[in-house]
C-alpha cells in the first residue's frame, strides 16, 4: 500500500483539486441512470408512451424513436442536475478555496498525497443552522487510488479537526446511489440521521434520495 499523507490545501493545488471535484461529481451520473432503469415506474412510463404513439401512428419506427427520445431526455435531465451542482459549487466555495476554507480557524480544506501527487480532497465548514456542528464537504478520491483507505483518512482528519475545535458533531450528506461512499461513512462511524427527497423534476421517476449522516464527537 502506498504511503499517503494528508496536508492542508495550498493555492498551487487548485487545478488538481478542481479536477478531482468535477470528476468525482460526474462519475455519479451512470449510477443515477442505472438506478432509474431499475425502477418499475420508469418502465411503465416508457411502455405507455410507446404504446400510445404506436396506437396513434401504427409506426414501429416512431415508437422506437420515441423510446430513444425519452431515454435521452431522462439522461439529459440527470446530467443537468449533476452538472448544475458542480457548476454552482465552482461559482461559490470552490471558486476561491483559500478564501472559503483557509481564512478561518473553524474551516479547512485538505488534500491527500501519494508521492507528492494530490489524489484526494475534503473540506469542512461549520453548519449555518448549528455552529457547534461541522459539515464535511467535497470528499473525492482519484479513481486509480481507491481501496487504499484514503477516504477513511480524510474523514478522520475532519473528525480530528472538529474535536480539536470543540465541535459536537460532524455532519455530511450523500446520495442513495453512492454505495461506496455510504459504506465508507458507516465504516468510519457515521450514523444515518435523515433521508430526504430532493425537489427536482425527474425525482418522482428516479427515486433519488439524499442521506444525511452524523458523527457525534465524544467529549
Swiss-Prot record:
Keyword terms: Acyltransferase, Developmental protein, Gastrulation, Golgi apparatus, Membrane, Transferase, Transmembrane, Transmembrane helix
Domain N-acetyltransferase: 62-218
EC numbers on record: 2.3.1.-
Location(s) in or outside the cell: Golgi apparatus membrane
Expression tissues: At the beginning of gastrulation, expressed in deep cells of the presumptive mesoderm. At later gastrulation stages, expressed at the interface between already involuted and preinvoluted mesoderm. At late neurula and tailbud stages, expressed in the deep mass of cells lying ventrally and laterally to the closed blastopore.
Role summary: Plays a role in regulation of gastrulation, possibly by controlled reduction of cell adhesion which is necessary for optimal cell motility.
One of the GO BP terms on file: negative regulation of cell adhesion
Source species taxonomy: Eukaryota, Metazoa, Chordata, Craniata, Vertebrata
Highest taxon of source: Eukaryota
Example of a GO cellular component annotation carried by this entry: Golgi apparatus
Membrane topology label: Multi-pass membrane protein
Signal peptide limits: none
Similarity comment: Belongs to the camello family.
Enzyme class: transferase
Matching InterPro entries: Acyl_CoA_acyltransferase, GNAT_dom, NAT_camello-type
Keyword Membrane tagged: yes
Record protein name field: Probable N-acetyltransferase camello
GO MF annotations in UniProt: N-acetyltransferase activity
A Pfam family annotated for this UniProt entry: Acetyltransf_1
Transmembrane segments: 42-62, 64-84
Main location (coarse class): Golgi
CDD domains in the cross-refs: NAT_SF (cd04301)
Amino acid at each position: 500500500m502506498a504511503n499517503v499523507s494528508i496536508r492542508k490545501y495550498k493555492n498551487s493545488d487548485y487545478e488538481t483539486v478542481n479536477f478531482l471535484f468535477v470528476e468525482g461529481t460526474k462519475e455519479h451520473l451512470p449510477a443515477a441512470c442505472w438506478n432509474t432503469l431499475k425502477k418499475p415506474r420508469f418502465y411503465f412510463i416508457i411502455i405507455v408512451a410507446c404504446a400510445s404513439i404506436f396506437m396513434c401512428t401504427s409506426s414501429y419506427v416512431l415508437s422506437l424513436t420515441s423510446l430513444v427520445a425519452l431515454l435521452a431526455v431522462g439522461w439529459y435531465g440527470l446530467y443537468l442536475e449533476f452538472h448544475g451542482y458542480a457548476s454552482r459549487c465552482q461559482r461559490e466555495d470552490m471558486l476561491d478555496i483559500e478564501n472559503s476554507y483557509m481564512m478561518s480557524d473553524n474551516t479547512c480544506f485538505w488534500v491527500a498525497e501519494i508521492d507528492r501527487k494530490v489524489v484526494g480532497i475534503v473540506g469542512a465548514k461549520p453548519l449555518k443552522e448549528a455552529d457547534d456542528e461541522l459539515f464535511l464537504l467535497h470528499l473525492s478520491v482519484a479513481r486509480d487510488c481507491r481501496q487504499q483507505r484514503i477516504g477513511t483518512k480524510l474523514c478522520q482528519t475532519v473528525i480530528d479537526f472538529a474535536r480539536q475545535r470543540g465541535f459536537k458533531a460532524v455532519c455530511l450528506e450523500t446520495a442513495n446511489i453512492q454505495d461506496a461512499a455510504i459504506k465508507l461513512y458507516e465504516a468510519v462511524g457515521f450514523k444515518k440521521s435523515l433521508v430526504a427527497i430532493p425537489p427536482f423534476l425527474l425525482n418522482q421517476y428516479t427515486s433519488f434520495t439524499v442521506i444525511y449522516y452524523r458523527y457525534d464527537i465524544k467529549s
